[in-house]
Amino acid sequence: MSATISLQQLTDQLDALEAEAVSAIAAAADADALEQLRVSLLGKKGRLSGVLGAMGKLPSEERPLVGQRANVLKTQVQNLLGERLQVVKAAALADRLLQETIDVTAPASGIPVGHRHPLITTTEQIVDLFSGLGYRVAEGPEVETDHYNFSALNIPEDHPARDMQDTFYLGGNLLLRTHTSPVQIRYLEENPPPVRIVAPGRVYRRDAVDATHSPVFHQVEVLAIDEGLDFSHLRGTVMAFLKAFFGDMPVRFRASYFPFTEPSAEVDVQWRGRWLEVMGCGMVDPAVLEGLGLDPERWSGFAAGLGVERFCMVRHGIDDIRRLYTSDLRFLEQF
């Protein structure tokens, strides 16, 4: 640039810069090209800055004219850059969407449908049946104390169930519950009779694993406490439940013994030509009621317990309890 410059020369440079900017911006194909143009036109070392730098050689009264024209051009270029950027971004998005178009007519690979585990559905069916009879669901901890698991249920200290060969002891006074009956005691401590509850849950016993036994399995306990309950109410409840669950299978009651019920009975159903035990039940022993501060002369009740695995195996014709725990999808997908 010469040592002297005129107002007309700078004005001509700004006009030429405007024309070049308009043409270059319109031809820019992507955001990177627009950014390069912005730097070359409006950057600190850009062409507009060069023109403004030469403005100092003009007489003071002419400088505002050049400055005003340069500001207008700068605003114009910024607007053109912004508008063109939106255009190229929209074009890039449209091109990407075109390339990524999904063919909705193409055959789908299919997503396998999940299945609820048969133990879960069996438990829910049992609980639903008793809920329909007016029973409320109750739950309790799986880690229990000796008191709730044994003593409060009238199980004496010399009873075989207390032996370490049958129970998982955790140290101190704690153990893994061997049945869900402790839920009944805990519930009665907090809720005065009359009560009707059904208590599903996981239980633990030191059983060897075979086709019919597992150290971890599931039980459902039923308890009813009210005035005037007798064995006929127990029998009627059990019969109604078994008919609803199994249909018209033959059922029989056999006299038995449980420390916390008296009289006690085991319940069998006829399955595959033989009698199969499915439940234990009985009238709540007066000693259990007295331990809870209830007058056995006023209150009576019955309790029943069943193994969910046994009910599930009978319902679905499963011959080995271990099948329920293998997580073999070929087996589980049948349900």
UniProtKB/Swiss-Prot annotation:
Keyword entries, A-Z: Aminoacyl-tRNA synthetase, ATP-binding, Cytoplasm, Ligase, Magnesium, Metal-binding, Nucleotide-binding, Protein biosynthesis
Subcellular location, principal: cytoplasm
Enzyme class: ligase
GO cellular component, one term: cytoplasm
Cofactor: Mg(2+)
Subcellular location: Cytoplasm
Protein's UniProt keywords contain Ligase: yes
Domain of life according to the entry: Bacteria
Record field: catalytic activity: tRNA(Phe) + L-phenylalanine + ATP = L-phenylalanyl-tRNA(Phe) + AMP + diphosphate + H(+)
UniProt: Mg(2+) binding residues: 262
Cofactor mode of binding and number, as noted: Binds 2 magnesium ions per tetramer.
GO molecular function: ATP binding; magnesium ion binding; phenylalanine-tRNA ligase activity; tRNA binding
EC number in record: 6.1.1.20
GO BP: phenylalanyl-tRNA aminoacylation
UniProt-listed Pfam families: Phe_tRNA-synt_N, tRNA-synt_2d
HAMAP family according to UniProt: Phe_tRNA_synth_alpha1 (MF_00281)
Family (UniProt): Belongs to the class-II aminoacyl-tRNA synthetase family. Phe-tRNA synthetase alpha subunit type 1 subfamily.
Subunit structure: Tetramer of two alpha and two beta subunits.
Protein name: Phenylalanine--tRNA ligase alpha subunit
Species the sequence originates in: Prochlorococcus marinus (strain MIT 9313)
Gene: pheS
